Amino acid sequence: MIQAIVTDIEGTTTDIRFVHQVLFPYARERLTPFLRAHQQDDDITALLVDLRREIAQPDADIETLITVLHGFMDEDRKSTVLKAIQGIIWRTGYLQADFRGHVYPEVAQQLADWHQQGLKLYVYSSGSVAAQKLLFGYSDAGDLCPLFSGYFDTHVGAKRDVSAYQKIANQLGIAPQALLFLSDIRQELDAAQLAGWHTCQLIRDLPDNDSAHPQVNRFDQIVLSLFTE
């Protein structure tokens, strides 16, 4: 029996276009002036130290680091440092109501129903935990954060790595066969399945005919009783 559901965000709870056409450009436009202005802030200083370590350039100056981060954005690299900095920039956007976090129309109600049924709900996304909380806390369906029991990002590993799902199961103290992972990306679901999890693929746009995972178009099409040990 499923005890907990772990969901991806981009393409799963949230339209990928919101991420790529709203969030990413917002951060890209503000990245350079933000880092120049805040490079001495304690949290930013720590992130820049991590970035220098990531690129193996311990003496890189701020302009070099800005160039590196723009390169990361160009290639959509899942850099933990980049995601953290983006999240800090997005916080201003949410607080100023420049945008609201998009969730598909049925998502909020289905999450609330599962929560009411006693299921534990978690998020696992390549975006930072801080960014995840902002998206759901300032969503166009209201504050959804009370529905979630926890959040995971790339600190536990990449989403296509089996070990990441093993770590999450261990941290939750829940047997893998009692966990359901929701994502639109087949390779992420493959990794979760290899870790012993149940999986369900959200098909919001183009079909994925190469996938062997159960598929639905909406959260309210997910029938939990079909996922048995």
From Swiss-Prot:
Its EC number is 3.1.3.77. Keywords: Amino-acid biosynthesis, Hydrolase, Magnesium, Metal-binding, Methionine biosynthesis. Transmembrane segments: none annotated. GO terms for biological process: L-methionine salvage from methylthioadenosine. It catalyses: 5-methylsulfanyl-2,3-dioxopentyl phosphate + H2O = 1,2-dihydroxy-5-(methylsulfanyl)pent-1-en-3-one + phosphate. Its cofactor is Mg(2+). It comes from the Bacteria. One of its GO terms (molecular function) is magnesium ion binding. Pathway: Amino-acid biosynthesis; L-methionine biosynthesis via salvage pathway; L-methionine from S-methyl-5-thio-alpha-D-ribose 1-phosphate: step 3/6; Amino-acid biosynthesis; L-methionine biosynthesis via salvage pathway; L-methionine from S-methyl-5-thio-alpha-D-ribose 1-phosphate: step 4/6. The keyword Hydrolase applies. Binds 1 Mg(2+) ion per subunit. Bifunctional enzyme that catalyzes the enolization of 2,3-diketo-5-methylthiopentyl-1-phosphate (DK-MTP-1-P) into the intermediate 2-hydroxy-3-keto-5-methylthiopentenyl-1-phosphate (HK-MTPenyl-1-P), which is then dephosphorylated to form the acireductone 1,2-dihydroxy-3-keto-5-methylthiopentene (DHK-MTPene). HAMAP family: Salvage_MtnC. Monomer. Belongs to the HAD-like hydrolase superfamily. MasA/MtnC family. NCBIfam families: enolase-ppase, HAD-SF-IA-v1. This is Enolase-phosphatase E1. It comes from Yersinia pseudotuberculosis serotype IB (strain PB1/+). The gene is mtnC.
